[in-house]
């Protein structure tokens, strides 16, 4: 073994000890996988991964995405040796207020690129980052090119999302994407061969990947594989590293305690191993398991100096490029800062009485010409979810050509959403992804991580109600609005509502809802109709100006001097309330109609504004095409809500409107009954 390799093995053993010690101290966690993966992460971080140690947010750094978040001790230990976590941080694993949570949460300044935990999502986010890198390089040059590395486990390969990642990365020929598969044949409750017998290498080769199989504990083989991955220009690379779970673990009698299912998800001592003997076997001090080896200090100090030299050279290249491309440099700065171009939303022409998905297409057409760093994706529905309003003015990504701004994800909603998260994590782009609202069920795990990570991803969900019609109940969302609006009640770690959910009521409001969506910093859902909706009336002269009040979450669209009742809805039901209000007015019953596109946004307004829109002491009536609970917080326990508490049926939507009572006559009758008239 060469001197360099022997030092790297010592570093890897240091990471094994630190990982096991962290879990022992926390009395919970996953030591075995971290001990098995230590060799690969050592070589990657000490010889290949390029970043600026003095500016961890350097935009053109290589990215490392950890998919199996339960292996966080391995990542934290490595980053601690690199100088980004303290010993105290490691000793606080999984404790209240620590910066080392059980599963990593995005913390770029310490080297954590992504929040991970739900298996499969991490490497799908890495795919998104790799696509974003190609998008940026296509516009500003290969001087900013960088690699995206993903670390996956057997569990991620088993997760269905791996199909989407494998297919898309291979199809697009993402040679900047390198994935390490830690194959140790162990998972939480079984050995892998008890649940999977497929040939993983052949599967990825069929998808068009460059597949390399190595001994994941052999420093030379790891290095050679990473060199080969760096030189690959046509395909993404999968390195299959065959490793040993609990590498170096010893039992009470000094016997090997490697390759055991029991060491996957609990401290070594709880699994039956001898922690002190394990530390000693790995060359450490059982009395001081958090000690940093001299070899680790030396290797990482040398790497830090090499990285600083690399960063200085990169800075010089960028400086020269900026001097020669001043206009492009300004655009790059706008991309990275999130600065948006000036857009006159009031001048966007909109036909009357359009479906809000069609209105969205019009806005996206404007964005395609104005917002150069927006990437729009669709899961094989662009001509139905109307994201084709964007596509018609650009083109989709293809292998070797990322000059367009559209990502055809194919039928893979969860993968698409995770890819959008990865794009947002990479930075410099605004990701948008569209599909039918009912298929948001496939996306919820990724939407949840969007909210947890506070990522600016825009979800366009169309065909928002039973008015999908003839396709029937499998395609008619009923409970979905209630589910996604719960995210407005769930607060993120910045004490904000973790998501903004907007269901605009007509074409003009859709325009202004899009304005909110692109100016946000959190994830946004736009829930849009399949069918045409009548343009709402105005209290003043210009509907578009009144629609701008969507920024307050809710506002009055039709009023009376002394309303006997307040009628509340979102989306297409607002127009139905207007129809009912006109019938009531003809009978001498004055009412107010309130449109609440986002209850969360509305509740964030001053109480005085909320009370001016929904005055106390006035009867309230609500209509929703979803579950009645959608409006319970606005209507109150004493009000009446017309909603659905059952699945839909297959029939033309106008027939369903009649059968389910979604018309002005029903509104008028139910309001009169509520008022005792």
Predicted regions and their residues:
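Non-catalytic, alpha-helical, charged scaffold/linker segments
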Residues: 278-312
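Thiamine diphosphate
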Residues: 1-147, 298, 302-527, 532-533, ...
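DG-centered beta-turn motif at the end of beta-strands
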Residues: 128, 146-159
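Residue-level marker for buried hydrophobic side chains located in beta-strands
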Residues: 150-151, 179, 377, 621
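Conserved beta-strand elements of the Class I
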Residues: 149, 375, 566-568
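Active-site metal-binding loops of divalent metal-dependent hydrolases
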Residues: 153-156, 243, 381, 436, ...
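Small/polar loops that bind or transfer phosphate-bearing groups
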Residues: 66-67, 153, 214, 378, ...
